[in-house]
Amino acid sequence: MDLSVTHMDDLKTVMEDWKNELLVYKFALDALDTKFSIISQEYNLIHGHNPIEHTKSRVKSFESIVNKLMRKGCEITTKEMKEHIHDIAGVRIICSFISDIYNVVNVLKQHEDLRIVKVKDYIQTPKPNGYRSLHLIIEMPVNLTNRVEYVKAEIQIRTIAMDFWASLEHKIYYKLNNDVPKQLTDELKEAAEIAHYLDEKMLGIKKEVD
């Protein structure tokens, strides 16, 4: 439904529609949280090692969705939202080692109730600023009382070092209103390389112990 309404009753109806749609994405996150908890416990039971340190999840705010639709030149409707925004539901998985990241992905590929739509591997091919992470766009069913809805979600999987770097970079850009001097961007990129070296070093030590 379109947001261009003139009467208060119409506006209330529109907002209810949006609230209901976003609730479906919240249910998707609930299901994913359960899925990752099962993966952690079963993997630990079989391999004696938990590949997931912790997870964070969020549903994009209404304001963020509207802003993103406007940037894309889309109408502000729930239909456009579903078609053009695939990270409304987002999960971030933090792993100890780089190998854990790919192990988690391989487990997800075996789940019949989840379809991997797109993979962006910024570990093998980092962004120009040094950012590393593995991004998945997945599609999954959400079983409601009277229907099944298929929704997309974004899963970001990264190591503790990658997450620390990304969090710091985000804070710096936010504090400086995206106007970051070249000296700082160069230092951030250097820090990203150091973080990656640490990841590789710790993975090497793990392999020696194993």
From Swiss-Prot:
Under what conditions is it induced? Weakly expressed during exponential growth with a marked and transient increase at the onset of the stationary phase. Protein expression is very low during the first 3.5 hours after inoculation (at protein level). Induced by alkaline shock.
Show the GO MF annotations: ATP binding; GTP binding; GTP diphosphokinase activity; kinase activity
Quote the subunit structure annotation: Homotetramer.
Looking up SUPFAM superfamilies in the UniProt record yields: Nucleotidyltransferase
Keyword GTP-binding in the entry? The reply is: yes
The superkingdom listed in its UniProt entry is Bacteria
Q: Which PANTHER family match?
A: GTP PYROPHOSPHOKINASE YJBM (PTHR47837), GTP PYROPHOSPHOKINASE YWAC (PTHR47837:SF2)
Kindly report, in one word, the top-level EC class recorded for this enzyme: transferase
Report keywords, A-Z.
ATP-binding, GTP-binding, Kinase, Nucleotide-binding, Transferase
Example of a GO biological process term: guanosine tetraphosphate biosynthetic process
Tell me the name of the encoding gene.
ywaC
InterPro entries recorded = GTP_Pyrophosphokinase, NT_sf, RelA_SpoT
Disulfide pairs here are: none
Q: Which family does it belong to?
A: Belongs to the RelA/SpoT family.
Q: What is its EC number?
A: 2.7.6.5
Role summary? Functions as a (p)ppGpp synthase; GDP can be used instead of GTP, resulting in an increase of (p)ppGpp synthesis. Overexpression in relA mutants (triple relA-yjbM-ywaC deletions and single relA deletions) leads to growth arrest; GTP levels fall drastically, various guanine-related nucleotides are synthesized (ppGp or pGpp), the cellular transcriptional profile changes dramatically and 70S ribosome dimerization occurs. Overexpression in the presence of a wild-type relA gene does not have these effects.
> Phenotype upon knockout?
No visible phenotype, double yjbM-ywaC and triple relA-yjbM-ywaC mutants are also viable.
Look up the record and name the pathway of this protein: Purine metabolism; ppGpp biosynthesis; ppGpp from GTP: step 1/2
- Record-given protein name: GTP pyrophosphokinase YwaC
Is Nucleotide-binding a UniProt keyword of this protein? Answer: yes
**Further information:** The synthase activity of YwaC is weaker than that of YjbM.
SMART domains, A to Z: RelA_SpoT
Provide the species name.
Bacillus subtilis (strain 168)
Q: What is the effect of changing residue 176 to F?
A: No longer inhibits growth when overexpressed in relA mutants
Q: Which reaction does it catalyse?
A: GTP + ATP = guanosine 3'-diphosphate 5'-triphosphate + AMP
